[in-house]
């Protein structure tokens, strides 16, 4: 998030409850998730999403030889995705990763907090698995975490000060 530098309260905040491996946001249906694509499905997704980033040429999409996370942020989110073809590669910036690895045409990937495992057959990616956590961009208030914190007895002041450190609440009316 480019604005995080200008606004120090916009940053990733841990939702760990402080003990026993429990997280306030673990009630989310997307707390831990997994997407899996076979080679044919991956090819169909990239044929649909990659033209915005690279020309496919008259022959269509080349053989996909690797898909990898090439850079991560300090919090472990994907900062750049690299897709390797027989003759070249394309690098997808963090802001576009969820749209390029779109599981369905109308649904982006849940978040950039994921790890990839590529299985190859004959030098070509035959299966790609993304194992991830959460949903969204990872900055600001986690909606599910706020619900979990409220259920644990935290009031709105404490919840907001946790997600937006250094801010103050003021009555405007």
Please describe what each predicted stretch is.
Residues 1-173:
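Conserved, single-site charged/polar hotspot
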């Amino acid at each position: 998030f480019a604005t995080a530098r200008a606004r120090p309260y916009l940053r990733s905040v841990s939702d760990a409850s402080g003990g026993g491996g429990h997280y306030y946001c673990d009630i989310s249906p997307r707390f831990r998730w997994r997407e899996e694509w076979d080679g044919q499905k991956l090819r169909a997704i990239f044929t649909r999403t990659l033209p915005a980033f690279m020309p496919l040429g008259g022959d269509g999409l080349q053989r996909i030889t690797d898909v990898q996370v090439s850079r991560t942020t300090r919090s472990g989110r994907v900062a750049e995705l690299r897709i390797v073809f027989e003759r070249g590669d394309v690098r997808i910036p963090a802001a576009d990763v969820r749209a390029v690895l779109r599981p369905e045409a109308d649904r982006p990937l849940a978040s950039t907090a994921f790890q990839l495992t590529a299985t190859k057959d004959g030098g070509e990616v035959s299966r790609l698995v993304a194992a991830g956590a959460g949903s969204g961009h990872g900055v600001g208030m986690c909606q599910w975490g706020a619900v979990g914190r409220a259920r644990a007895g935290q009031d709105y002041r404490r919840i907001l000060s946790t997600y937006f450190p250094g801010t103050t609440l003021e009555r405007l009316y």
